Amino acid sequence: MYKFAVFGNPIKHSLSPNIHIQFAQQTGFEVSYDKILAPIDDFSSSAQAFINQGANGFNITVPFKLDAFKFASELTLNAQIAGAVNTIKIEQDKIIGENTDGIGLVNDLTHNLGIELKDKVILILGAGGATQGILLPLLKQQPNHVMIANRTPFKAIKLAKDFAKFGKTCGFDLDKIKHDPVNIIINATSTSLYGKMPDIASGVANNAICYDLMYGKQTPFMDWATINHGSMISDGLGMLIEQAAVAFEFWTGVKPNTEQVLSNLRS
């Protein structure tokens, strides 16, 4: 039996056990998958205790992705560039850290929503860890360019410079967003958690695909996109399921089908 879990704080709301148990049923693997509430200041002890119990791997959510990055003994290229880890695989005496967030986002956009990213103008709201985790997979799709807007502009500018070798990027203040047309807007800020939306120019959403990394039937960003005439509006549930599928394959070597799981969770 595979022994998996997800670490977070809070963690009660997590859909990960539901998703991975569906993957297990689909692929025929015996899997246990727990939710573990780790102390805010001591992720490593909780993670090590789980490993000592015979864990095969685990997922990591807010606020422990940087802790997991430091905890891993080895890092994949994705994790190194993302600067954060959301998936760990235990392989003999190795603790291998991976980041599946960006691949999950791209898979949801391209496979589930049918969106072509090549040559598109993409605007990302926010310049924190979530943005850093999705930039490389997005840039690999060869968009025209990726703009990063953040309330603290130097973070956006630095992130854009750090990723410039992978594709055309720029960073600036949220207040500097103009009405210039963009094809895709991705909300990577945490404002949806607090029922808010960044104060940005309304016209920028006109006819744009608007995607919230947060998931929920109607997030504040989705409300904003609706009012401002976004052409296609989606939450991040598909991304959650797609990144989980990449993690499941990382652990087991078998790629699960996400379509039915997404349908089940939507209903």
Curated annotation (Swiss-Prot):
One of its GO terms (cellular component) is cytosol. Pathway: Metabolic intermediate biosynthesis; chorismate biosynthesis; chorismate from D-erythrose 4-phosphate and phosphoenolpyruvate: step 4/7. It catalyses: shikimate + NADP(+) = 3-dehydroshikimate + NADPH + H(+). GO terms for molecular function: NADP binding; shikimate 3-dehydrogenase (NADP+) activity. SUPFAM superfamilies: Aminoacid dehydrogenase-like, N-terminal domain, NAD(P)-binding Rossmann-fold domains. It is an enzyme of class 1 (oxidoreductase). NADP(+) binds at G126, A127, G128, G129, A130, N150, R151, T152, P153, F154, K155, L213, G236. Pfam families: SDH_C, Shikimate_DH, Shikimate_dh_N. The active site is at K65 (proton acceptor). Coiled coil: none annotated. Shikimate binds at S14, L15, S16, T61, N86, D101, Y215. InterPro entries: Aminoacid_DH-like_N_sf, NAD(P)-bd_dom_sf, SDH_C, Shikimate_DH, Shikimate_DH-bd_N, Shikimate_DH_fam, Shikm_DH/Glu-tRNA_Rdtase. Homodimer. Involved in the biosynthesis of the chorismate, which leads to the biosynthesis of aromatic amino acids. Catalyzes the reversible NADPH linked reduction of 3-dehydroshikimate (DHSA) to yield shikimate (SA). NCBIfam families: aroE, PRK00258.1-2. This is Shikimate dehydrogenase (NADP(+)). It comes from Ruthia magnifica subsp. Calyptogena magnifica. The gene is aroE.
